[in-house]
Amino acid sequence: MDQAQHVHFVGIGGYGMSAIARVLIDLGYKVTGSDVAMNDLAKKLEARGAVIHIGHNAAHVEGADSIVYSTSISKDNPEVIAGQALGIPVMHRSQMLARILNERTGVAVAGAHGKTTTTSMISHVLEECGVDPTFIIGGELMSAGTNAKAGTSDYVIAEADESDGSFLEYRPMYEIVTSIEPDHLEHFDGDFNNLKQAYVQFLSHLKPDGKAILCIDDSHVREVMPSVEKTVVTYAVDPNFVAQAQFSATSIECGDRCSTCQVYHKDERLGELCLVVPGKHNIANALAAIVVCLDIGLSFDKIAQALSTFSGAKRRFQIIGDARGVLVVDDYAHHPTEIIATLSGARASGRRVIAVFQPQRYTRTYFLMDEFSRAFAEADEVIITDIYSPAGEEKIEGVTSEVLVQKIRTNSHPRAQYIPTKEQMQEHVFKELQEGDLVLTMGAGDIWKSAYWLAEKLEK
């Protein structure tokens, strides 16, 4: 990286921005930043020496050698404008991450689903096996208590965000694609083919001896695979595709809070894998981690042992409370495929599943309305709250939670309910709870607060 000593982050409180800021602090850089409010991530950075400003002001960038902004920051932000006027290099978050990732042995994890968990699994295994990686995660690695760290080894593990095409900045040694879905299409002219082509470009940016690690359970991954000109390593958990995959999992058993399987490399049985994070989708995520860690030089036995202690990433089927016989779980699932996978994991518990979903963004709800309406069949009870939308997003006529509930009733769950506010929903759910229930809150907004409210109420 360039030896710019003072880096200022505009919008420092997000997971992606705060992770990069944390790594730079660990590397000895002076870090300042601003955001509209102070949150836990910003407080942790402040405790490590960062100077955090609340609100955006041109004066905040004085003395900075570089300015980093996130996708959510508008072009007319006063700090961005001031930086440009002063001749300070101004770059997108992905460009700063590329500086960290591209100069070392990088592992970039992309895909519509499973990025955070897969990145976390690889980071956890390397940590447990003494490799000491740098990791930059879009969520908190529970075992480390942080979303980022600068390690002493040459390995950098990071999420590669496809949502705005910024993953094209990276030149890693390993690229993982867990899945491809028609999400974030507002950044791709509403055309899914443009997004798929972006993945092909991403996979062409590997280092010359790099490897593309692809989940062939996913039909869209299989579709783009013939266009990949780099070395390809495939993995699968779907019985329809395990015979075609180089790495596979069979004899899968998913229980209340664990999953087990047998792992194979082609026809060779590598051994048994036991995870304390439930769901078949987590076995797929673990397979991707196994492929990378084996290639790095770790033995399967060491990898499996490390994965057996992986407790998960924050907001990824995270158990918030367990009281009065009721399990309260929160998950970041905000896409139909993620909802289906998360509900499948919940269903394996054998409990009555009460699913509470807070849609996020009018654009996503518009593009995926039909898919959302078909995603809730595995739940016993379904409650939909109002759409959570970031500031500045315009409403779309006809795109409401009421409309979504009507479609869910037709396509996957006839008893789906619309309860507008979190407060109303919380009181309703609490009154309906029975011993043996599993309450599952899902969404990318602030629905997680309801999980904590319910857990605290149950413990009183």
From Swiss-Prot:
Pfam families: Mur_ligase, Mur_ligase_C, Mur_ligase_M
Catalytic activity as recorded in UniProt: UDP-N-acetyl-alpha-D-muramate + L-alanine + ATP = UDP-N-acetyl-alpha-D-muramoyl-L-alanine + ADP + phosphate + H(+)
Pathway(s) the chain acts in: Cell wall biogenesis; peptidoglycan biosynthesis
The keyword rRNA processing appears for this protein: no
Entry's localization field: Cytoplasm
Enzyme Commission number, as recorded: 6.3.2.8
Entry annotated with the keyword Lipoprotein: no
InterPro entries per the UniProt record, alphabetical: Mur-like_cat_sf, Mur_ligase_C, Mur_ligase_C_dom_sf, Mur_ligase_cen, Mur_ligase_N, MurCDEF_pg_biosynth, UDP-N-AcMur_Ala_ligase_MurC
Positions annotated to bind ATP: G111, A112, H113, G114, K115, T116, T117
GO cellular component labels: cytoplasm
GO molecular function terms noted in the UniProt entry: ATP binding; UDP-N-acetylmuramate-L-alanine ligase activity
Organism superkingdom: Bacteria
EC category: ligase
Keywords from the named record: ATP-binding, Cell cycle, Cell division, Cell shape, Cell wall biogenesis/degradation, Cytoplasm, Ligase, Nucleotide-binding, Peptidoglycan synthesis
Any GO BP annotation: cell wall organization
HAMAP family: MurC
Function: Cell wall formation.
Annotated family: Belongs to the MurCDEF family.
NCBIfam families xref list: murC
Protein name according to UniProt: UDP-N-acetylmuramate--L-alanine ligase
Organism of origin: Brevibacillus brevis (strain 47 / JCM 6285 / NBRC 100599)
